[in-house]
Amino acid sequence: MSVTVYVSATLRGFVNRNAKLLAEGNTIKDVLCSQTKKSDIIPDGYIEYETEPREYRLNSISTIINVNTAIEDVYSSPYDQVKEQLELAIESLREHQESQLINNDDYGLLKNVPDSQRIQTRNGAPTPDDLDELITKVWKEPSFFLAHPRAIAAFERECTKRGVPPVTTNIAGGTFITWRGIPIIPTNKLLVDGLKEPKSQSGKTNILLIRTGEAKRGVVGLYQAGMKNEQSRGLSVRFRGIDDKGVASYLLSLYCSAAILSDDAIAVLEDVEVGEYYDYE
């Protein structure tokens, strides 16, 4: 099934990309600000918009899980074997979804960061100064940083070197470090030299800073709501039947994409070196 999301005001502005086409340094529209009593002419005009906004297609991630009915019959106590195996498969789909949201060549966040929102590290390793520069790019209500665990460790070493250890915070029962009050969320989907788990101590990666939410014109996830056999947002599980060998089959389908609603909703720190270490006396 092909699912298409059209970026227009007709979809509740969900992924509205009819952004105002403004020249750099100009305001949205000329306005009148005057305390004089004379009859000044109030500026008028129209806001420019994209006549053919970008079209987002939902990416399909699917897999088929087979479960022998004998396993279900004999070993479903104390745990439901079908449920447990489906949950493992769903977790695998979610991991792949996370990777696609960051690295997909079409809608991935890394591929869609505007050039004006890309900055380089000062000296390779991610320093507090680098993250401060990143905040200047997403200064309107930033939600969180995204970084590989190796990049987070490299940043903590730089903080220790400068005597400014980052503060920690608790989110959903987990402890995360923060910088300037913004949590730094780990993900191995921001690859180091193209790998989730790099073999060597050195390597380069990227750090993202993101503002999320439609109301804030941030980064939003797209999914198909109201599907048949829907288990959660954008995810459906369909029973395909039992074959002659007594093997039950289930089709798992996940539809997803992402949109950046305004240029200043995301920024990236590029070429982050994770292999800088120091000796402390």
Give each language-model segment a name:
Residues D105, K140-S143, T205, V247:
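Short, surface-exposed beta-edge/turn micro-motifs
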Residues D40-T69:
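Intrinsically disordered, low-complexity linker/loop segments enriched in Gly/Pro
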Residues V113-I177:
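Extended, solvent-exposed, turn-rich assembly/linker loops in the middle of proteins
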Residues S62-E141:
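Alpha-helical scaffold segments that mediate packing/assembly in large oligomeric complexes
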Residues N59-T63, E141, D244-A248:
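Residues at beta-strand starts and edge strands
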Residues M1-T51:
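N-terminal "assembly arms/tails" that initiate or stabilize quaternary assembly
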Residues V167-E281:
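Sequence/fold signature of self-assembling virion shell proteins
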